């Protein structure tokens, strides 16, 4: 419980400093809690580094990164540097996490035309339905990113009309940056509800193959986004 409180205190403080909301995937941890802040974020990071295990340190770093990027750029480079040091994060792992998070945040740069947003929604929706279930967490995640909910309806229609293979071929026509971004969101949808099934993994592998995402990129995205959403290490 002490580690969870420290985790949330650090994130609440960083969110306020960088003018970010607390992201929805932390809702289950923050329910019925009054989130506090710290006057000394660096000291709190040092305490976390001494108290947390490796998985908890990684999760904290990933979620700090999620609150430290705006318009595709780091807002506070000192925060990244201090958190890498205090939490004992390997520099290469840190860069993988930051790149994965940046890929999600840069979505509005890559998807601008209405028809592209329709396809954007189709990918994560197909992933969400791969286990025959569309959870409230998955729905809230998708709604957070789209500029208009009508694109979700259009994406659902695309999913209904196409087989997974046909959908993959359609998504393959997007630009390389769009495909990589879409792969990141599909991975996030797989992790967002705290559990994933073999059917989701199979769909993801098919989608990555059809969208021609290289193994190096998909591995980096998987590692970074799993670390971001693996908040169960604090439960």
Regions found by a protein language model. Name each.
Residues 1-235:
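Small-residue-enriched hydrophobic alpha-helices in membranes
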């Amino acid at each position: 419980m002490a580690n969870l409180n420290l985790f949330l205190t650090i994130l609440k403080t960083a969110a306020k400093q960088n003018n970010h909301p607390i992201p929805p995937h932390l809702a289950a941890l923050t329910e019925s809690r009054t989130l506090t802040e710290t006057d000394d974020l660096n000291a709190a990071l040092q305490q976390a580094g001494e108290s947390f295990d490796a998985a908890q340190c990684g999760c904290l770093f990933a979620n700090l990164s999620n609150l430290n990027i705006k318009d595709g750029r780091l807002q506070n480079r000192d925060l990244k540097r201090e958190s890498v040091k205090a939490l004992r994060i390997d520099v290469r792992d840190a860069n993988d996490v930051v790149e994965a998070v940046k890929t999600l945040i840069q979505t509005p740069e890559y998807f601008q035309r209405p028809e592209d947003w329709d396809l954007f929604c189709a990918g994560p929706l197909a992933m969400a339905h791969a286990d025959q279930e569309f959870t409230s967490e998955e729905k809230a995640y998708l709604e957070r990113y789209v500029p208009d909910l009508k694109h979700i309806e259009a994406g659902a229609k695309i999913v209904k009309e196409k087989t997974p293979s046909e959908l993959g071929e359609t998504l393959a026509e997007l630009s390389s940056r769009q495909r990589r971004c879409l792969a990141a969101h599909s991975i996030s949808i797989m992790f967002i509800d705290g559990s994933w099934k073999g059917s989701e993994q199979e769909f993801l592998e098919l989608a990555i193959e059809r969208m021609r995402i290289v193994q190096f990129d998909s591995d980096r995205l998987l590692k970074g986004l799993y670390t971001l959403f693996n908040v169960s290490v604090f439960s």
